[in-house]
Amino acid sequence: MDRYLVFGHPVRHSKSPFIHTLFARQTQQELEYGLAEPAVEEFATSLRAFFAQGGKGCNVTVPFKEQAFALVDRLSPRARRAGAVNTIKLTDDGVLLGDNTDGAGLVADLKAHGVALAGSRILLLGAGGAARGALAPLLAEQPEALVIANRTHARAEQLAAEFRDLGAVSAQTYERLGGHFDLIINSTSASLQGELPPLVPALIHADIAIYDMMYGATDTPFIAWAKGQGARQTVDGLGMLVEQAAEAFTVWRGIRPGTKQVLRELKRNLGTL
């Protein structure tokens, strides 16, 4: 039976085995999917050993995505742009192909929730790996403008400069943010620490869409805050998790699983996984 893994540290909380087991059942693919939690300095050795022992593919999560980028034999265009790898496939000719499905998962989930991207004004909070992975897929949807805000403004400026060839992307400090946005995406991990990005409430209006890449059994702090400011459409990152997994499954197996039922099952079981 074909073997797949998710590498991370920590990774015991990962929902990936649950998701991919449901995908396999739905598409009648025979595979097993497990967890690997090597020490940071042992990731390269563990990755090579997994494929040497017959592994077919893996997902890679924090803190190994940048290491994986350097370890694979070949990169997909979207992984090269993202500077990080979250999906690796052993190809038929024995090559380790590195891909990044995070941004595609984000865009798919936004569309599933009816969020219009073409011609929109998007505010992206954060300039780390999650933001980098999202930029190319978001800009491919041709928004009117995409503004990056980050606590360290120089990082936002650098990221905007790297992606300016793909569309109207710019950087702004939190203090100077103003104007109208149709969508705000929080790519920071602030919600995990119970913190909020330093946004002024005036940016929130009834018709704005709010997206937090983090998720939980209850509203994230960012989503709870936005609702309190009058935002009517708020979405957490659970759907993005399922959509990026579906994209990875497609890379590995050549068949695209449906995501709606899997997302429903995941929400139903979130408190026990």
Curated annotation (Swiss-Prot):
It holds the Pfam family Shikimate_DH. It catalyses: shikimate + NADP(+) = 3-dehydroshikimate + NADPH + H(+). Shikimate binds at S14, K15, S16, T61, N86, D102, Y215. One of its GO terms (biological process) is aromatic amino acid family biosynthetic process. InterPro entries: Aminoacid_DH-like_N_sf, NAD(P)-bd_dom_sf, SDH_C, Shikimate_DH, Shikimate_DH-bd_N, Shikimate_DH_fam, Shikm_DH/Glu-tRNA_Rdtase. Coiled coil: none annotated. Its EC number is 1.1.1.25. Pathway: Metabolic intermediate biosynthesis; chorismate biosynthesis; chorismate from D-erythrose 4-phosphate and phosphoenolpyruvate: step 4/7. NADP(+) binds at G126, A127, G128, G129, A130, N150, R151, T152, H153, A154, R155, M213, G237. Transmembrane segments: none annotated. Keywords: Amino-acid biosynthesis, Aromatic amino acid biosynthesis, NADP, Oxidoreductase. CDD domains: NAD_bind_Shikimate_DH (cd01065). It comes from the Bacteria. GO terms for molecular function: NADP binding; shikimate 3-dehydrogenase (NADP+) activity. One of its GO terms (cellular component) is cytosol. The active site is at K65 (proton acceptor). Involved in the biosynthesis of the chorismate, which leads to the biosynthesis of aromatic amino acids. Catalyzes the reversible NADPH linked reduction of 3-dehydroshikimate (DHSA) to yield shikimate (SA). Homodimer. Belongs to the shikimate dehydrogenase family. This is Shikimate dehydrogenase (NADP(+)). It comes from Aeromonas hydrophila subsp. hydrophila (strain ATCC 7966 / DSM 30187 / BCRC 13018 / CCUG 14551 / JCM 1027 / KCTC 2358 / NCIMB 9240 / NCTC 8049). The lineage of its organism: Bacteria, Pseudomonadati, Pseudomonadota, Gammaproteobacteria, Aeromonadales.
